[in-house]
Regions:
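Amphipathic alpha-helical repeat scaffolds of TPR domains
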Residues: 119-129
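Short intrinsically disordered, low-complexity coil segments enriched in acidic
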Residues: 1-11, 149, 154-158
Length: 169
């Protein structure tokens, strides 16, 4: 999509799909009826104060879809010390919640019927998990026997670690 938005024929979408299925790197404004969030409990991790909102979006994907609108609602400038600019620093400071969030994202994308969307997204998520563990724990992550196939990514995850977490160290 040359205009960095969804095909107009797509009338409903789940928020995580914008990133994982449609590969859009965009900011969104999301309007949610509170009734859909009554049962949602945002997970808390002791000593941590940040968790990606993607957890909530994955929860909402089980409730229904959003109707995408391609219109400008607000204009903004990123703050130099804001969330987006410091995301990898936040990931390091909030390790348990970030791993929880990434693992939930992994489970979400593994349900995709399209093998390309599923594996491309899964690889990026696993590399983020491995890179975060290398950075935060200072060790090469051990993998469970059922995850042995992901060992092939460890070298790439190290490069990912250097590129993504260098500023946060």
């Amino acid at each position: 999509q040359g205009n960095n938005w969804l095909n107009p024929k797509i009338l409903e979408v789940n928020i995580p799909d914008l990133k994982y299925k449609y590969h859009l790197k965009i900011e969104t404004c999301i309007v949610i009826n509170n009734a859909y969030l009554v049962d949602f409990e945002f997970p808390c991790f002791e000593g941590e104060n940040f968790l990606s909102e993607e957890i909530m979006y994955i929860y909402l994907s089980k409730k229904g879809y959003f109707c995408p609108q391609n219109r400008k609602i607000y204009c903004f400038d990123y703050l130099e010390d804001g969330l987006t600019s410091n995301i990898f620093k936040l990931w390091r400071k909030n390790f348990k919640g970030t791993i929880f969030s990434l693992e939930n994202s992994y489970m979400y994308v593994m349900s995709f019927p399209n093998i390309f969307d599923r594996w491309w997204s899964a690889i990026k998520i696993k590399m983020n998990i491995q890179a975060l563990k290398m950075t935060t724990l200072g060790v090469i992550p051990t993998l469970k026997s059922e995850e042995a196939g992901w060992k092939i990514l460890l070298g790439f995850s190290y490069l990912w670690k250097v590129a993504r977490f260098k500023k946060s160290e």
